[in-house]
Amino acid sequence: MAVTPSLLRLALLLLGAVGRAGPRPQGATVSLSETVQKWREYRHQCQRFLTEAPLLATGLFCNRTFDDYACWPDGPPGSFVNVSCPWYLPWASSVLQGHVYRFCTAEGIWLHKDNSSLPWRDLSECEESKQGERNSPEEQLLSLYIIYTVGYALSFSALVIASAILVSFRHLHCTRNYIHLNLFASFILRALSVFIKDAALKWMYSTAAQQHQWDGLLSYQDSLGCRLVFLLMQYCVAANYYWLLVEGVYLYTLLAFSVFSEQRIFKLYLSIGWGVPLLFVIPWGIVKYLYEDEGCWTRNSNMNYWLIIRLPILFAIGVNFLVFIRVICIVIAKLKANLMCKTDIKCRLAKSTLTLIPLLGTHEVIFAFVMDEHARGTLRFVKLFTELSFTSFQGFMVAVLYCFVNNEVQMEFRKSWERWRLERLNIQRDSSMKPLKCPTSSVSSGATVGSSVYAATCQNSCS
């Protein structure tokens, strides 16, 4: 069934709310939960009307009913019946003069859609006005949704390939790459959690919203599974920030300390990356359950509850920004010590800066202290665009910089290629020499010498 613009808007209302699960600005668009609550009131009024309204005097007629969208009185056969647009719609104020229509057939049965058990309705007058739709917030949210979906899909694919590469080559197994692998895993989990969240929302709208089954939709929102989805997403996002912090701390440790126990420090990094987020995500979930148990926990009305998660993430962003500044200072000092010309210094400094930004998540500093409740209008859209687009593609950039363009990885690929090429040449050489009937001593000695040379060459290239 095709999704109407009105249903699309309802879907995007929630997508916009969960894109950054922060507090809602005052005066923001009505939420899905509020719409469903109004729908329940509308249904209650309709049921009372269906019970109390007098019946038609005599004859054949279509029975009064509530079809989960509008409240319908008894209808005379062979005629159109119209009622005002339901007042629970978020855009009801713009369709006050509109009506929704149904047709009562001559047999006294409401007309159904072709090959369907769903009733036929004409909702055209109750649809949200398309005027200015091009620049509407919903269109902007839809654009952001497409951008971050493409970004997370690309990042997920690149990170899975990069992880397989680092795991496959034994010579790449070291503490540095173990940290990279955990960072890759955090990006992968973040992307998966976003996909699961979006799949849950799409499921809601493909079953309940498209058929105007609002009660079933709210029941899903009130279910434990829905809340666990968003709790999982918050943990994956927090773990991703803290593995970026681990990368920054490890980089600073390499620069500041010449000797340290990598094995011991790696266990500490594991605790920071995967353990610390539990220390504030679980308390946030408990507080939400006890004091703000509304909907899917997609928004935070009380700013103090949201700060339980936001402040530790701001701490991670701040520390990584300080590491970024420190590393840039060290790079400048080393470039000047090499007596390079100013042009070369600027070029290499720019390259180092652009490389460090995605690796440390430095771009988060731009809007780190602009809370969602303070961001409105253009500022809110710019903030959402910057955060969602950069964050979704960040995993791809990390995979490229830490794996695909890494010299060690490229060297391992060259070694594997040379190994494969030499083995293939050796097989071809052996197969071409088999048919020849030469003296046993000369042929066997030549083959043995040739095989030894190839084996030695291969061994040297792998060492």
UniProtKB/Swiss-Prot annotation:
Glycans are attached at residues 63, 82, 115. Keywords: ADP-ribosylation, Cell membrane, Disulfide bond, G-protein coupled receptor, Glycoprotein, Membrane, Receptor, Signal, Transducer, Transmembrane, Transmembrane helix. It comes from the Eukaryota. Residues 1-21 form the signal peptide. GO terms for cellular component: plasma membrane. It is a multi-pass membrane protein. InterPro entries: GLP1R_7TM, GPCR_2, GPCR_2-like_7TM, GPCR_2_extracell_dom_sf, GPCR_2_extracellular_dom, GPCR_2_GLP1/glucagon_rcpt, GPCR_2_GLP1_rcpt, GPCR_2_secretin-like. Pancreatic islets, stomach, lung, rat insulinoma cell line. Residues 165-175, 252-265, 329-348, 405-463 are cytoplasmic. The modification ADP-ribosylcysteine is found at residue 341. The chain crosses the membrane at residues 140-164, 176-201, 228-251, 266-290, 306-328, 349-370, 384-404. Belongs to the G-protein coupled receptor 2 family. May form homodimers and heterodimers with GIPR. This is Glucagon-like peptide 1 receptor. It comes from Rattus norvegicus (Rat).
